[in-house]
Amino acid sequence: MFVIVDLETTGGIYNKEKIIEIGLIKYDGSKVIDTFEKLINPFVKIDPFIEKLTGIKNNELNSSKGFNSYSADIYNFLKNSTIVGHDVKYDYRVLKNELKKNNFILENEFLCTLELMRECYPGLTSYKLKTLSKIFDIKLVKHHRAMDDAKATLELLKLCNE
């Protein structure tokens, strides 16, 4: 079982990042089983650069629940799966830190579609998610929104598993 993960975060100081949006897709290797998508209040004001990049506004986050309200659901969604992401090490680290603060230990294996695409399709000029989506005609409506990026990442996983 795979769970494709994409996070949007506050950015900033290493290990101080907060999740502002999460998109999860549970995939059994042939079909999507379930999805999970939430805006998450980081309880800090997000930088105008992040607002512009993601389109997520501070006022939207202020009316959302904090990560602790979703931590058990997120942990259970991820349980017994391989976590998949594009440049996954960042998302995995941030997610692991947030779950740890809520007494959940994330020890899942993970798979990086950026590295996978480099192996499956060597010699491309760029392996950024947006570029790969254009090259392989993958629908990416709102880049830097968690669920849209997760959906595009799933399509990259499928390309390498064909």
Labelled PLM ranges:
Residues R145-K158:
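Acidic, divalent-metal-coordinating active-site segment for phosphoryl/phosphodiester hydrolysis
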Residues C160-E162:
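Mixed-charge, glycine-rich, non-catalytic linkers/tails in nucleic-acid processing enzymes
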Residues M1-N108, P122-H144:
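Conserved non-catalytic scaffold segment of RNase H-like nuclease domains
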Residues V5, L111-T113, L157:
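Short beta-strands and strand-loop turn motifs
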Residues Y70, R118, A152-T153:
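Short Asp/Glu-rich motifs
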Residues R93, E115, K151:
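Active-site phosphate/pyrophosphate-handling residues
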Residues I105-M117:
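Conserved beta-strand -> loop -> alpha-helix junction used to position metal-binding or nucleic-acid-contacting
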